[in-house]
């Protein structure tokens, strides 16, 4: 028949972070926003591998405040998607939500982009929205209790 129903299968390509993230940084620098899947478990419980995607976009330095999640190069030149937990002079201290002690230091110049939205189960949540900002604020402030909260989360 003239019209034919074909099953179209969406191809999924997986690239190493070392390959894709420099390109993501370049696109953001050119003014684009880029959506990528979350990989790894360092941002649990708020961002989960295989469940969530984040949209990254540009920023102005004044937006790099405590609680904001950014894609940045650490001191070893690796890209990390972590939350800013403190600012010290011209340094940003980053930590994954699922990390209890490990932190990274970077500078605003090493930040490639900030998370502007989180996509979970097809629904988009603005990272600048009240709900997401409240979660971020509380999580950063709950650092002394985080060990117990993460243990509880991992048992669920």
Where are these regions (language model features)?
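Feature for secretory/organellar precursors and membrane-associated catalytic proteins
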Residues: 12-100
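Extracytoplasmic/periplasmic terminal helices and flexible tails
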Residues: 7, 113-156
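Generic recognition of short, well-ordered alpha-helical interface segments
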Residues: 79, 106, 110, 144-147
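Aromatic- and Lys/Arg-enriched surface recognition patch
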Residues: 87-132
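Short, surface-exposed, charged/polar-biased interaction segments
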Residues: 45, 49, 59, 64, ...
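Short alpha-helical interface elements
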Residues: 49-53, 75, 95, 109, ...
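Short, Lys/Arg-enriched N-terminal segments with co-localized hydrophobic residues
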Residues: 1-10
């Amino acid at each position: 028949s003239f019209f034919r129903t074909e099953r179209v299968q969406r191809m999924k390509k997986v690239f190493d972070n070392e390959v894709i993230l420099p390109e993501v940084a370049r696109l953001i620098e050119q003014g684009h926003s880029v959506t990528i899947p979350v990989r790894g478990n360092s941002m649990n419980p708020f961002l989960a591998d295989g469940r969530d995607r984040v949209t990254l976009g540009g920023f102005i330095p004044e937006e790099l405040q405590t609680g904001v999640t950014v894609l940045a190069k650490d001191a070893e030149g690796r890209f990390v998607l972590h939350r800013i937990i403190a600012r010290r002079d011209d340094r940003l201290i980053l930590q994954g939500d699922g990390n209890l002690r490990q932190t990274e230091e970077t500078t605003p110049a090493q930040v490639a982009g900030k998370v502007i939205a989180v996509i979970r189960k097809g629904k988009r949540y603005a990272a600048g929205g009240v709900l997401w900002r409240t979660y971020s604020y509380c999580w950063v402030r709950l650092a002394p209790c985080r060990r117990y909260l993460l243990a509880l989360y991992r048992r669920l």
